[in-house]
């Protein structure tokens, strides 16, 4: 007679939209062999609404629609599930993403070539140490084991290779001993010869510095060394990278051309001014039909440009050019006094 095992089912909130997933797992080979005692949403266990008993379930199954590599499970619930499981109990539904937390909290990970994956709670039973008898077994006429050789401590006064009664003693060599230095080390005093050597070193350094300054003075001298022009350092190419507008006569950059400019800068400025004036002279001109479309004071124009509204209409369509204006007669002058009531 097999003993029934109790199981606990933890459900991810997203499984409520996929009830067929829960039915498939309950009919599977794992939960079908157990008695489902309780089913809880994982968020109720996470916020502390439900606290399961310790060592109550043999199997805990976590049902989630997430992929194994994308499972997001609260790590703080792993020790809680460890307490809830019985010794050697199994936890299904999690993956290697929480492998470290599982090992820390006392789980063993079992994976059968990817076909079955679960965590097992380690049993608290520890194997008793096995005692091995060193005495020989004398049953069935077995011969007694050979005794191990025994050794004696060497006596300092006993000669090697002879009995203690021998008169000769072996003198053991002692280790050398050292004494602590008690004298104070006197400070090293400088002699006159050492001071003279230092003076010689300073003089050699001064002579080296003087030779360096003399070299640079000779290099900067215009009589002995040629000066380098800055323009010579720029490589001349077919297309110069430096572009700057300069006056051909004064060779200076100016915002405006000078009076007697002959480099063409003045002509360029005049062309720019003429082009600006030409654009300003282009005034928008309307034809007579366009003017009648805009001018609503022309006599004989009873219908607006929309073709449906008249000048005297108080309510006009959205496309009428008279929209927003009061009803008036053609040729009537409009002033603020005439439309004060409408305002």
Swiss-Prot record:
<dbReference type="GO" id="GO:0016226">
    <property type="term" value="P:iron-sulfur cluster assembly"/>
</dbReference>
<feature type="binding site">
    <location>
        <position position="263"/>
    </location>
    <ligand>
        <name>[2Fe-2S] cluster</name>
    </ligand>
</feature>
<feature type="binding site">
    <location>
        <position position="258"/>
    </location>
    <ligand>
        <name>[2Fe-2S] cluster</name>
    </ligand>
</feature>
<feature type="binding site">
    <location>
        <position position="306"/>
    </location>
    <ligand>
        <name>[4Fe-4S] cluster</name>
    </ligand>
</feature>
<dbReference type="GO" id="GO:0051537">
    <property type="term" value="F:2 iron, 2 sulfur cluster binding"/>
</dbReference>
<dbReference type="GO" id="GO:0009055">
    <property type="term" value="F:electron transfer activity"/>
</dbReference>
<comment type="subunit">
    <text>Monomer. Interacts with TAH18. Interacts with MIA40.</text>
</comment>
<dbReference type="GO" id="GO:0005758">
    <property type="term" value="C:mitochondrial intermembrane space"/>
</dbReference>
<keyword id="KW-0963">Cytoplasm</keyword>
<feature type="region of interest" description="Disordered">
    <location>
        <begin position="195"/>
        <end position="228"/>
    </location>
</feature>
<feature type="binding site">
    <location>
        <position position="317"/>
    </location>
    <ligand>
        <name>[4Fe-4S] cluster</name>
    </ligand>
</feature>
<feature type="binding site">
    <location>
        <position position="247"/>
    </location>
    <ligand>
        <name>[2Fe-2S] cluster</name>
    </ligand>
</feature>
<feature type="compositionally biased region" description="Acidic residues">
    <location>
        <begin position="218"/>
        <end position="228"/>
    </location>
</feature>
<dbReference type="InterPro" id="IPR031838">
    <property type="entry name" value="Dre2_N"/>
</dbReference>
<keyword id="KW-0001">2Fe-2S</keyword>
<keyword id="KW-0411">Iron-sulfur</keyword>
<keyword id="KW-0004">4Fe-4S</keyword>
<feature type="binding site">
    <location>
        <position position="261"/>
    </location>
    <ligand>
        <name>[2Fe-2S] cluster</name>
    </ligand>
</feature>
<comment type="function">
    <text>Component of the cytosolic iron-sulfur (Fe-S) protein assembly (CIA) machinery required for the maturation of extramitochondrial Fe-S proteins. Part of an electron transfer chain functioning in an early step of cytosolic Fe-S biogenesis, facilitating the de novo assembly of a [4Fe-4S] cluster on the scaffold complex CFD1-NBP35. Electrons are transferred to DRE2 from NADPH via the FAD- and FMN-containing protein TAH18.</text>
</comment>
<feature type="region of interest" description="Fe-S binding site A">
    <location>
        <begin position="247"/>
        <end position="263"/>
    </location>
</feature>
<dbReference type="InterPro" id="IPR046408">
    <property type="entry name" value="CIAPIN1"/>
</dbReference>
<feature type="region of interest" description="Fe-S binding site B">
    <location>
        <begin position="306"/>
        <end position="320"/>
    </location>
</feature>
<feature type="short sequence motif" description="Cx2C motif 2">
    <location>
        <begin position="317"/>
        <end position="320"/>
    </location>
</feature>
<dbReference type="GO" id="GO:0051539">
    <property type="term" value="F:4 iron, 4 sulfur cluster binding"/>
</dbReference>
<feature type="region of interest" description="Linker">
    <location>
        <begin position="189"/>
        <end position="240"/>
    </location>
</feature>
<feature type="short sequence motif" description="Cx2C motif 1">
    <location>
        <begin position="306"/>
        <end position="309"/>
    </location>
</feature>
<keyword id="KW-0408">Iron</keyword>
<dbReference type="Pfam" id="PF05093">
    <property type="entry name" value="CIAPIN1"/>
</dbReference>
<dbReference type="GO" id="GO:0046872">
    <property type="term" value="F:metal ion binding"/>
</dbReference>
<feature type="binding site">
    <location>
        <position position="309"/>
    </location>
    <ligand>
        <name>[4Fe-4S] cluster</name>
    </ligand>
</feature>
<feature type="binding site">
    <location>
        <position position="320"/>
    </location>
    <ligand>
        <name>[4Fe-4S] cluster</name>
    </ligand>
</feature>
<dbReference type="InterPro" id="IPR007785">
    <property type="entry name" value="Anamorsin"/>
</dbReference>
<keyword id="KW-0496">Mitochondrion</keyword>
<comment type="similarity">
    <text>Belongs to the anamorsin family.</text>
</comment>
<protein>
    <recommendedName>
        <fullName>Fe-S cluster assembly protein DRE2</fullName>
    </recommendedName>
</protein>
<feature type="compositionally biased region" description="Acidic residues">
    <location>
        <begin position="195"/>
        <end position="206"/>
    </location>
</feature>
<keyword id="KW-0479">Metal-binding</keyword>
<feature type="region of interest" description="N-terminal SAM-like domain">
    <location>
        <begin position="1"/>
        <end position="188"/>
    </location>
</feature>
<dbReference type="Pfam" id="PF16803">
    <property type="entry name" value="DRE2_N"/>
</dbReference>
């Amino acid at each position: 007679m097999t003993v029934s095992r109790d199981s606990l089912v933890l459900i991810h909130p997203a499984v409520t939209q996929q009830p067929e997933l829960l039915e498939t797992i309950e009919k599977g080979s794992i939960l079908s062999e157990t008695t489902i005692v309780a089913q809880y949403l994982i968020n109720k266990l996470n916020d502390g609404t439900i606290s399961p008993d310790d060592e109550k379930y043999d199997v805990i199954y976590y049902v989630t629609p997430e992929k194994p590599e994308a499972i997001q499970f609260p790590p703080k619930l792993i020790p809680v599930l460890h307490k809830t499981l019985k010794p050697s109990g199994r936890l299904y539904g999690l993956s290697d993403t929480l492998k470290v937390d599982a090992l820390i909290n006392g789980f063993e990970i079992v994976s059968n070539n990817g076909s079955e994956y679960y965590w097992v709670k380690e049993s608290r039973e520890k194997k008793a140490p096995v005692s091995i008898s060193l005495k020989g077994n004398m049953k069935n006429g077995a011969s007694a084991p050979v005794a191990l050789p025994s050794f004696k401590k060497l006596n300092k006064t006993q000669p090697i290779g002879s009995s203690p009664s021998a008169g000769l003693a072996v003198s053991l060599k002692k280790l050398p001993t050292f004494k602590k230095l008690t004298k104070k080390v006197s400070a090293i005093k400088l002699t006159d010869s050492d001071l003279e050597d230092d003076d010689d070193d300073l003089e050699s350094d001064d002579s080296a510095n003087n030779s360096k300054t003399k070299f640079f003075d000779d290099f900067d001298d215009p009589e002995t060394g040629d000066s380098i022009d800055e323009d010579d350092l720029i490589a001349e190419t077919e297309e110069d990278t430096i572009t700057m507008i300069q006056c051909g006569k004064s060779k200076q950059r100016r915002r405006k051309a000078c009076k007697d400019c002959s480099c063409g800068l003045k002509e360029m400025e005049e062309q720019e001014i003429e082009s600006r004036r030409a654009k300003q002279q282009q005034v928008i001109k309307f034809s007579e039909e366009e003017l009648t479309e805009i001018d609503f004071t022309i006599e004989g124009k009873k219908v607006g440009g929309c073709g449906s509204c008249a000048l005297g209409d108080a309510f006009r369509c959205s496309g009428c050019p008279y929209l927003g204006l009061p009803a008036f007669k053609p040729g009537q002058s409009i002033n603020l006094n005439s439309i004060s009531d409408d305002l």
